[in-house]
């Protein structure tokens, strides 16, 4: 069975109530490719609003979640709180949280486990820095990040994961991995899934690409065998996000 193409829009810390509603209403009314799963991820303050405005075909994701169910964790949001708000997805492991907030592979893996066990699906982000790529360590880095998750998750739980490969050097920089570079890493990730998890996980897990995805480069990237969609940053705030969702039309 072919993997369902997946396009996520990560609004990051951008927008306000009005713009969030406008972006989602634009998606609601657009002629979107029906074979694509679309998920938007606004700032936490607008999650409830996004879920109320978005039609049922559009998923809504938190940009983060904590690994404890409740308690004295100022500023954090629990899995149960997100589920009560009818949020089905969360992004975890984004490079901005790895780099700026010093989140470790192990902490991200624990959060991934807590999210899945609590009923969320996870967009699990991995990727290398420019230094790591230039040192030919790309596969080592993404494998290390994946291995941390593999220690926490059962083989069955990978069915709740979408892997997002985002080379750090391409996020928000305008630099984009070539289609060949992206496909090479996606292929290596799929091989890792087969070797470390199962043949079924390798066949069914969606591996999406992020890093300066735009309406200009999405069609070529979408043609690659192991690229199952996109995690879009800045372009998800613009009308061109519709073109990215429709990359395969």
Swiss-Prot record:
InterPro entries: Aldolase_TIM, TIM_sf, TrioseP_Isoase_bac/euk, Triosephosphate_isomerase, Triosephosphate_isomerase_AS. One of its GO terms (biological process) is gluconeogenesis. One of its GO terms (molecular function) is triose-phosphate isomerase activity. Keywords: Gluconeogenesis, Glycolysis, Isomerase. It catalyses: D-glyceraldehyde 3-phosphate = dihydroxyacetone phosphate. It comes from the Eukaryota. The keyword Isomerase applies. Coiled coil: none annotated. Pfam families: TIM (PF00121). One of its GO terms (cellular component) is cytosol. SUPFAM superfamilies: Triosephosphate isomerase (TIM) (SSF51351). The active site is at 94 (electrophile), 166 (proton acceptor). Its EC number is 5.3.1.1. Pathway: Carbohydrate biosynthesis; gluconeogenesis; Carbohydrate degradation; glycolysis; D-glyceraldehyde 3-phosphate from glycerone phosphate: step 1/1. Substrate binds at residues 10, 12. Belongs to the triosephosphate isomerase family. Homodimer. This is Triosephosphate isomerase. It comes from Emericella nidulans (strain FGSC A4 / ATCC 38163 / CBS 112.46 / NRRL 194 / M139) (Aspergillus nidulans). The gene is tpiA.
